[in-house]
Amino acid sequence: MKILVFGARDYEEPVIKKWSEEHKDVQVDIYPENMTEENVVKAKGYDGISIQQTNYIDNPYIYETLKDAGVKVIASRTAGVDMIHFDLVNENGLIVTNVPSYSPNAIAELAVTQAMNLLRKTPLVKKKVCEGDYRWIAELLGTEVRSITVGVIGTGKIGATSAKLFKGLGANVIAFDQYPNSDLNDILTYKDSLEDLLKEADLITLHTPLLEGTKHMINKDTLAIMKDGAYIVNTGRGGLINTGDLIEALESGKIRAAALDTFETEGLFLNKKMNPGELTDPEINKLLSMEQVIFTHHLGFFTSTAIENIVYSSLSSAVEVIKTGTATNRVN
């Protein structure tokens, strides 16, 4: 049984080797680059492959080559699988697995951390200190979490964990989800619609998957519903927000500040070291220039605990498919 791991990062390699030592009957090889039409032939002779989130594959040749090579499974080292073309997957008889839950705490903790950074104006404080300005001024006056209403949009494992953390800090927590979780009724109040939540929340945090019905759910119309001076935290998917509309709301002051960890065009820069001027996306560059935006590059998942869980789950799912023809974490 053989598995080839494409796009293996230096922080993943020790975990891959650890998993391999615990599964002597499985040969796991590492290839540092993402899978492309030029290198997909390296999968020949392997039963399964593993890819990561920046490996966008929409070329029919890649899927045909995987099928001809005898590959049975594409095991994604991600929760979201929007980088995969499922019509082509199904046409070629391949199975895709994901890692639906690797560490809800990792992403939830970043969401809460960044919310607190927004409320306490940490970036502005740092700027003032770097300028030698140590005064207590109205511009730096912060807000306590216990004084606000937090709107959690999406209450799956990550959203639920975020809600619990915000509640622990004393916030009034409201939520919207198409499928409410009654187990959370003691810590939050569900609203009947997204609009109802947006009207009441001082800060919203996004934790929904990117689907046809959720794409650009935060747009000029929904932003207009929100309180003046509200905050937005997005550690979900970049496509949940219409970036241009958000920029306009930030410039007008309708939205006071935003902490963004995911972006619709993040494939242009994720996990790359770029030279000045190399990143030319005008909306990304605008966000980077705005003092009221905290910009992180899809780091929500990036903890040692989460990386180990991701690698272990991905490789174990690949083995499950190879042995049984399906897997618990199968997504097609």
Swiss-Prot record:
Keywords: NAD, Oxidoreductase
Keyword NAD: yes
UniProt keyword NAD, yes or no: yes
SS bond partners: none
Coiled-coil blocks: none
Gene3D superfamilies: NAD(P)-binding Rossmann-like Domain
GO terms assigned for molecular function: D-lactate dehydrogenase activity; NAD binding
Subunit structure: Monomer.
Protein known as: D-2-hydroxyacid dehydrogenase (NAD(+))
Organism: Clostridioides difficile (Peptoclostridium difficile)
Taxonomic lineage from the root: Bacteria, Bacillati, Bacillota, Clostridia, Peptostreptococcales
Underlying gene: ldhA
